[in-house]
Amino acid sequence: MKKPVNVAMVGLGFGAEFIPIYQAHPDAKVHAICRRNEAELNKAGDTFGIDQRYTEYEQVLADPEVDFVHINSPIPDHGKMTLQALDAGKHVMCTVPMSTSIEECEQIVDKVKTTGLKYMMAETVVYSREFLFVKEMYDKGEMGKIQYLSASHPQDMDGWPEYWEHMIPMHYATHVVSPVLGLTNSKAEYVSCFGSGTVREDIQKKSGNKFAVETCHIKLLDSDLSAHIWRFLYDTARQYRESIDVYGSKKSFEWTLTEDGKHVVHTAKKPEPEIPELVEVPDYAHLLPEPIRKFTQSIEDADHLSFVQGGGHGGSHPHMVNEMVSALVEDRDPWPNAVTSANWTCVGICAHQSALKGGEIVRLPEFTLK
């Protein structure tokens, strides 16, 4: 593909954090921005010096200069907006999850296959410095044989936009699914999930879900490994956390219990008091083009008053931008591609189905295993 690659940013709440990263990337250009609220749209356009501004998504898709759309819309719109973009001949990067229905996930996978367009689910966890640290240890053989993986994402969503009250915990599970599958580049074959506890009645009515917590075991395809994940959204006391614990034959990694703590690496065959070591996880900005390395850390931008850029989600944002832009320039699939994104997303959908059936095993759809 030609350089620079023209991106249209769709959704400018969380999405606005990506604009300066694209603007600094040597192979990308923010061609257009889209937001329904015209006042907020113009504010963002003026702040970042972007002239092409749209209040309607259909206007973005009709613009022949747009190469790909970066979708940051509310979760219920992800599948529909992705399919619209693919139908319009646009490549897509979309924030998580891919969809909340297996049917839409399959439609996206099929459409990517038939059109040859690129799709990437913008999963932050697998580009966070913590995941990259564990992945580096694993790839170097320092962890030995992986024996078990576990991940958690407790988060109290009271006070967030109202549509969250309609969500089911495992329908927003890619932050825990992706690291336990992504570390060994595996896919999930089947799941068994239990619901636990109950949320208050108004949440039950809106979401159709009674479970406060959903806890799931995942069997990895063509592997002797299983992984354990759990989620909650309401009515359970716990500080926000997106964690991954990885247990190997030589070394293991455990996530800190609290936000201000340090992660722990355990090394086998040492005297018992010496097995655990508190570690400082390094930054991985060196993997990025120099102009966007600064965005792995939080920075105050003097040109954009009070706007804090970079550093979000473990420094993952510039890595995701670089992956999508590089995939388009190099004409290769981004990671995660459509099939992998569907597998990660459908784990959560299948997990909730399992919970409704008392933990019955539910197999992942065949289209996610290819």
Q: What are the residue ranges of the model-derived segments?
A:
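N-terminal Rossmann-like dinucleotide-binding module
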Residues: 1-48
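C-terminal capping/lid region of NAD(P)-dependent oxidoreductase domains
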Residues: 117, 144, 353-370
